């Protein structure tokens, strides 16, 4: 992180200007994100670019965040990994699990596709929740712009922030962060259990949404979304 861990005074104005040039439909949401990061700059994810890090909280950094915020909302297809598979895995399948030699190439390819599918489920979950929560005033922190937080909400009357972190499974690595600087708690929720065949929708935080969020609706969203971009 840059030594200057703060955002410039006109950060919200810059946020609107930058997003107006990229996608005006997201300007209000992005402004709210920058409002949050201006108050809690230590919660901002560390930019990959050294040049952007040098200009933390300034116009160049805000434009970088705006581009990521927008691009992460564009349709995203499952992409099989490009890594070369380890042939010893096939050997283990053949010897230890009695998988016939003629089936190994098919299994290898299906494993690649399965990995691609598994890797995108978390993104699909966030997109589904964004569709449900953003009309209620929550903002999807697309572009991994905020550490340990996926959705934020601002109560203007109380000047209070709501923070939500979502995970696809209960054994997915979670950030150890449970609060931000002013002791605002980060609500945490996961969708599925790793040790039993069950989902966790019934425990979605009531204070976040009163909408009927459930597994059937999520699966319908996933199927519709993937068919549109196929």
From Swiss-Prot:
Keyword Cytoplasm (UniProt): no
Q: Which UniProt keywords apply?
A: Endonuclease, Hydrolase, Nuclease, Restriction system
- Lineage, top-rank taxon, reads Bacteria
Q: Which Pfam families does this one have?
A: RE_SinI (PF09570)
Keyword Nuclease on this protein?
yes
Instruction: Enumerate the GO terms in the molecular function aspect.
Output: DNA binding; type II site-specific deoxyribonuclease activity
Q: What class of enzyme is it?
A: hydrolase
Any single biological process term in GO: DNA restriction-modification system
Per the record, what are the reactions this protein catalyses? Endonucleolytic cleavage of DNA to give specific double-stranded fragments with terminal 5'-phosphates
Write the Enzyme Commission number(s) for this entry: 3.1.21.4
Q: What is this protein called?
A: Type II restriction enzyme SinI
User: From what organism does this protein derive?
Assistant: Salmonella infantis
């Amino acid at each position: 992180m840059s030594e200057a861990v703060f955002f410039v005074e006109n950060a919200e104005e810059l946020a609107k200007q930058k997003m107006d040039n990229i996608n005006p439909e997201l300007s209000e949401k992005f402004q709210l994100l920058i409002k949050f990061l201006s108050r809690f700059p230590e919660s901002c994810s560390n930019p990959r670019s050294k040049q952007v890090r040098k200009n933390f909280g300034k116009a160049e950094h805000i434009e970088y965040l705006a581009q990521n915020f927008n691009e992460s909302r564009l349709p995203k297809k499952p992409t099989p990994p490009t890594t070369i598979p380890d042939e010893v895995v096939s050997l283990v399948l053949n010897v230890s699990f009695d998988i016939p030699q003629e089936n190994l190439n098919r299994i290898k390819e299906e494993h690649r596709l399965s990995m691609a599918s598994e890797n995108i489920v978390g993104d699909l979950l966030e997109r589904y929740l964004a569709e449900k929560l953003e009309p209620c005033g929550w903002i999807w922190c697309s572009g991994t712009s905020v550490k340990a937080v996926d959705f934020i909400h601002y109560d203007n009357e109380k000047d209070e922030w709501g923070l939500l972190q979502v995970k696809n499974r209960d054994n997915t690595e979670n950030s150890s962060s449970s609060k931000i600087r002013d002791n605002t708690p980060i609500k945490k929720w996961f969708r599925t259990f790793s040790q039993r065949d069950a989902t966790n929708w019934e425990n979605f935080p009531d204070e976040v949404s009163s909408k009927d969020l459930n597994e059937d609706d999520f699966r319908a969203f996933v199927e519709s979304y993937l068919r549109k971009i196929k």
